Design a protein with these regions (language model features):
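Conserved N-terminal subdomain of the carbohydrate kinase-like
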Residues: 15-20, 42-123
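Histidine-anchored nucleotide/phosphate-binding helix
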Residues: 30-39
């Protein structure tokens, strides 16, 4: 069942490398948002962010293409894709470390007027506190773009005060 809703995930993409089973899964808050929007029936779903040029990046790209998530405004740069090391202890996921977003942590997405024009085509743009998109949020607000934002469960009061004025829907996962 399709709904006349369009959703864009803007920001992070990573692979979670589950060391105990030697398996790599695509993820990241913005990627997961785009995939689940599509799976839940959004008529249009897209992801916009920066990929590295390694096997991890290609895995995420292929997975998004398999899910029919639009990638038209993504960038691919030379460098490692975001990756985290994960295991499971007593049934709970435990993060062992990460490369801090890989190339995406070093080369931040800077929105221009063409990006904003594209983003205005969506009912909601979703980002989060691990997306490295904070400095672009005022541009989204000024353009009248509806923003949802996941603060996760480890943001500070100062961070909330800095980001909340640019957010229409806040989540704390």
């Amino acid at each position: 069942m399709a709904f006349n809703v369009s959703a864009l995930g803007f920001g992070d993409n990573v692979v979670d490398r589950y060391e105990h089973i030697h398996t790599m899964y695509p993820g990241g808050n913005a990627v997961n948002f785009a995939v689940y929007a599509k799976k839940c029936g959004a008529a249009r779903s897209a992801y916009m962010g920066i990929f590295g040029n390694d096997a991890a990046a290609e895995h995420v790209i292929a997975s998004l293409e398999d899910e029919d998530v639009e990638l038209a405004k993504c960038k691919q740069l030379i460098g490692a894709n975001g990756a985290s090391r994960v295991t499971v202890v007593d049934g709970d996921r435990v993060f062992l470390g990460s490369n801090e977003g890989g190339i995406r942590g070093d080369a931040r997405y800077v929105l221009d007027r063409f990006d904003l024009s594209y983003m205005k085509q969506f009912d909601v743009v979703h980002s989060g506190n691990y997306c490295f998109t904070e400095r672009e949020l005022p541009k989204l607000k000024a353009a009248g773009i509806t923003v949802s934002f996941d603060f996760s469960d480890d943001s500070t009061d100062e961070y909330y005060e800095q980001i909340a004025p640019y957010v229409d829907f806040a989540f704390f996962s």
